[in-house]
Swiss-Prot record:
GO terms for molecular function: sodium channel regulator activity; toxin activity. The keyword Ion transport does not apply. It is found in: Secreted; Nematocyst. A synonymy between H.magnifica and R.crispa is controversial. GO terms for biological process: regulation of signal transduction. It comes from Radianthus crispa. GO terms for cellular component: extracellular region; nematocyst. InterPro entries: Anenome_toxin, Myo_ane_neurotoxin_sf. The keyword Disulfide bond applies. It comes from the Eukaryota. Binds to site 3 of voltage-gated sodium channels and inhibits the inactivation process. It holds the Pfam family Toxin_4. This is Delta-stichotoxin-Hcr1e. Belongs to the sea anemone sodium channel inhibitory toxin family. Type II subfamily.
């Protein structure tokens, strides 16, 4: 599932969701892109 990163923009309707939901921790080579912490899942994307 996709998720909204912090820099995707504040407007949920027009923002592009560039992140991917990952369980607990992001995969190697990925970074958490959402400041809000949830114990169940993180919003991650590939490191540039």
């Amino acid at each position: 599932a996709s998720c909204k990163c912090d820099d995707d923009g504040p407007d949920v309707r027009s923002a592009t969701f560039t992140g991917t939901v990952d369980f607990a921790y992001c995969n190697a080579g990925w970074e958490k892109c959402l400041a809000v912490y949830t114990p169940v899942a993180s919003c991650c994307r590939k490191k540039k």
